[in-house]
UniProtKB/Swiss-Prot annotation:
This is 2-succinyl-5-enolpyruvyl-6-hydroxy-3-cyclohexene-1-carboxylate synthase. Signal peptide: none annotated. It catalyses: isochorismate + 2-oxoglutarate + H(+) = 5-enolpyruvoyl-6-hydroxy-2-succinyl-cyclohex-3-ene-1-carboxylate + CO2. Disulfide bonds: none annotated. Homodimer. It comes from Sorangium cellulosum (strain So ce56) (Polyangium cellulosum (strain So ce56)). Keywords: Magnesium, Manganese, Menaquinone biosynthesis, Metal-binding, Thiamine pyrophosphate, Transferase. InterPro entries: DHS-like_NAD/FAD-binding_dom, MenaQ_synth_MenD, THDP-binding, Thiamin_PyroP_enz_TPP-bd_dom, TPP_enzyme_TPP-bd. One of its GO terms (biological process) is menaquinone biosynthetic process. Pathway: Quinol/quinone metabolism; 1,4-dihydroxy-2-naphthoate biosynthesis; 1,4-dihydroxy-2-naphthoate from chorismate: step 2/7; Quinol/quinone metabolism; menaquinone biosynthesis.
């Protein structure tokens, strides 16, 4: 259609329909084939448009936004290999049940398989890592095709959110001319298009299953019988109702007397009032002690959320496979051991609330067996926490001290973004639960180390609250262009973004693994890969304030200065490269020695029989 603006109208209608379905943020990468979408997004008054040069960083930026808001952010890129760079973020969205929409602009079908430039097969580019794929199709003036544009947009948002949140891929083809043209007069499709632009979006009411009453009744009965129960909280996505989730877990603990083993990424550790609840700190450390594991066999485990990161806990449940373990999960089959006795598919907060209400009304007696069991875990937590605190004392800077200081310095109500490999584990080893409210952002879906800075920048834009990111040096190296996003994200001057990089010169998590025994040369060449970098020039290039800390005192001052700034700060916290593994091994040895003396809580009558209940 020469002289037609159908392609522009098509894109405007699509962006408008996305906004009507709930989209508020669109992340745009440069490219010619996506021109109609870019212009439509920039001219829209209903979405915020964020311009990002690098597609991989852009996709993680959108992911970070979605993690904070719970709404799908939209990533838009041009044709060719551009979309492929979004795959890591798409995978993380898929694995972590985070809503995300990727729109890849594409060439028309007649250019496929003909050696046309920047033309690849983009159909189902992301494979099974998306909840839904759709072809938007080439712009078509028919009324049905125009109406289908609004439907496809509504479907994309709906499928990104329910029944299982995750990523959605829309492939949008455009022919040239891609830019708006001077139309010669009214176009035949214009009246239908204008009516659709005025029309309210389709209202989607998702069916939602509640908590199964019979499952709650059966689980409540098991809780009432169990003498050695545990509530285990693995990684969970931060939501607006984090406080409700904490209240529900703590209420269930009070009703049952079961200790709560909560990881730092569970959204339970920071902000809850824990009176009357045993929530032992550093539980991974004491569960690494064989004597403690052998002496304290559980008879019931309620595991909430994603599988815990803790290696100590993994060993514990492997050694007590006869204990009944019930996994409660909103989405996914969260049982990598394939040994759970039951999976309750439902919102953990609702399951905990229902259980607490039923058990609270039953006047459950917390007898001596339960009290002794809880006291043993409380004492083990005190021992582990004491050793962790002593390991971080003084002015010497260590990996554990960095994690502890960063978690303690985060302003109340702010966001702590935690990197993978060692930082997420140091958070659990060295940082005790706190009444100070924090939202903890993490990438435990696929547990990758890429895109962390970009995602934190997206979170900062979405939250308009202070964000602190703790990550390793190789993670930062993976996402250097994210520093540009960090600088831009804080340009509004509303809140700081403080990035703390643990500079231990390489991937030191491998020094904790059996491969470390094969010799230093192999380890360095193939695994830890030290790069001997100084990140000060990178901070200068991207316009971030920079601090270098070699002692605890210097880190404390750098953190304080970072939170005083409205912009972005990069703090390079330098520790000896080969120090971490030896230090944590000593910590675990000290904890093992002291918890071994605790013995076991005496079992009540019937407890052993319940261990064998199918």
């Amino acid at each position: 259609m020469g002289g037609s603006n159908l392609h522009s109208a098509w894109a405007q209608l699509f962006v408008r329909a996305l906004a009507q379905a709930g989209v508020r943020d669109l992340v745009l990468c440069p490219g010619s084939r996506s021109t109609p979408l870019a212009i439509a997004a920039m001219e829209s008054e209903e979405v915020r448009c964020h311009s990002v040069v690098d597609e991989r960083a852009a996709a993680f930026f959108a992911l970070g936004q979605a993690r904070v808001t719970g709404r799908p952010s939209v990533f838009v890129c041009t044709s060719g290999t551009a979309g492929a760079h979004a795959l890591p973020a798409i995978i993380e969205a898929h694995q972590s049940f985070t809503p995300l929409i990727a729109i890849t602009a594409d060439r028309p079908w007649e250019l496929a398989d003909a050696a046309a430039a920047q033309t690849i097969d983009q159909t189902k580019l992301f494979g099974d890592h998306v909840r839904h794929f759709a072809e938007l199709g080439l712009p078509d003036p028919s009324p049905l095709a125009l109406r289908a544009v609004t439907r496809i947009a509504a479907q994309a948002v709906t499928r990104a959110l329910s029944p299982t949140p995750g990523a959605v891929h829309i492939n949008a083809r455009f022919r040239k001319p891609l830019e708006p043209v001077d139309a010669t007069g009214p176009e035949p499709w214009q009246a239908e298009w204008e009516a659709l632009m005025r029309r309210a979006g389709t209202r989607v009411v998702s069916a939602r299953a509640g908590v199964d009453g019979r499952a709650i009744e059966e689980l409540a009965a098991r809780c009432a019988r169990a003498e050695r129960g545990l509530i285990v909280c693995g990684p969970a996505e931060s939501r607006e109702d984090d406080a409700r989730a904490r209240r529900a877990v703590l209420a269930l603990s009070r009703a049952t007397g079961f200790p709560v083993l909560a990881e730092g990424t569970s959204q339970i550790c920071f902000g809850g009032l824990t009176e009357g609840v045993v929530m032992p700190a550093s539980f991974d450390s004491f569960l690494r002690a064989p004597e403690f594991r052998a002496a304290n066999a559980p008879d019931l485990i309620l595991e909430l959320g994603a599988p815990p990161t803790s290696a100590g806990y993994a060993t514990y449940i492997a050694e007590h496979a006869s204990a009944r373990r019930v996994v409660v999960s909103s989405h996914g089959w969260n049982d990598p051991t394939s040994a759970a006795a039951a999976l309750v598919m439902g919102e953990p907060v609702e399951v905990c609330e229902a259980l607490a209400a039923r058990l609270g009304g039953a006047a459950l007696s917390l007898g001596r067996g339960r009290r002794d069991w809880a006291a043993t875990f409380a004492r083990a937590g005190e021992i582990a926490a004491g050793h962790a605190a002593r390991a971080c004392a003084g002015d010497e800077l260590t990996e554990g001290a960095i994690a502890r200081m960063v978690a303690s310095a985060c302003p109340a109500g702010s966001l702590l973004a935690i990197g993978n490999s060692m930082p997420v584990r140091d958070l659990d080893t060295y940082c005790p639960p706190s009444a100070r409210a924090l939202r903890v952002l993490h990438q435990r879906g696929a547990s990758g180390i890429d895109g962390l800075v970009s995602a934190a920048a997206g979170a900062r834009v979405a939250a308009a609250a202070p964000v602190t990111l703790l990550l390793g040096d190789l993670s930062l190296l993976h996402d250097l262009t994210g520093l540009l996003l960090a600088a831009k994200a804080t340009g509004d001057g509303r809140a700081p973004l403080v990035i703390v990089v643990v500079q231990n010169d390489g991937g030191r998590i491998f020094e904790h693994l059996p491969i470390a025994r094969r010799g230093a040369a192999l380890l360095e060449r193939c695994f830890t890969m030290p790069q001997h970098l100084d990140f000060a020039p990178a901070a200068a290039m991207f316009g971030l304030a920079y601090e270098r800390a070699g002692t605890a005192g210097e880190l404390a001052r750098a953190l304080a200065a970072g939170y005083q700034r409205a912009g972005a700060t990069l703090i390079e916290a330098v520790v000896p490269p080969h120090d971490g593994a030896a230090r944590v091994a000593r910590l675990w040895s000290d904890v093992r020695r002291d918890v071994a003396a605790l013995g076991s809580a005496p079992a009540a009558d019937g407890a052993a029989a319940d261990l064998q209940t199918p």
